[in-house]
Amino acid sequence: MTILGIQLKALSRASLIHKKKVMVLDDWGPFDDGFEEASLTKGSEDEVQFWLAEELQKQNKVKILDSISLEELGRIIFQERQDVNKPSSLVKLPKDFYFKVSALIKDLKMRKDLESLEQLKKASQLINEIISIRTRKIIELAFLGITDQEILDRLTAEEILVYKNIKYIIEHSIGDIIGNTAN
């Protein structure tokens, strides 16, 4: 596994402990995870760690609220296409965008009806196009050596890792090719 792969895996695991907003569909708890005790009351909104929210959603105890929809993916792809060849035109995404996308795909795969299958196909197409456009823009940013924080703030945590790794490779490979390491 590459360093980037390890970094992305660590980021993915760390996101499991981030809190997510949920709508409580049925009373649940108390539950002590060693750090805090949680009890959820039907009809309320609460925040729980994502790994717990996912498990409780499978049991129909909660519904995760801060998820991403097909409509939102459509809006993002529309905006990304506006200036597809301009790397500084990256749309600002939530830092946990790819985590939300992963949760959407997981949720659609769990459902076994025809409509969900069609939504899964549509979501996959949108996500692949978003990734393709954004990756192209990120490579251009790294190649041009762009360090404008306003632009970099539009990247997700995963994209920041990709950007930094590509930038490092470009800077150091060019130096190696001509016989000295660039800084």
Question: What residue spans do the PLM features occupy?
Answer:
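Compact, well-ordered interaction domains used in eukaryotic information-processing assemblies
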Residues: 27-70
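N-terminal, Lys/Arg-enriched amphipathic/low-complexity engagement segments
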Residues: 1-33
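Charge/polar-rich, low-complexity and marginally structured segments
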Residues: 2-12, 69-183
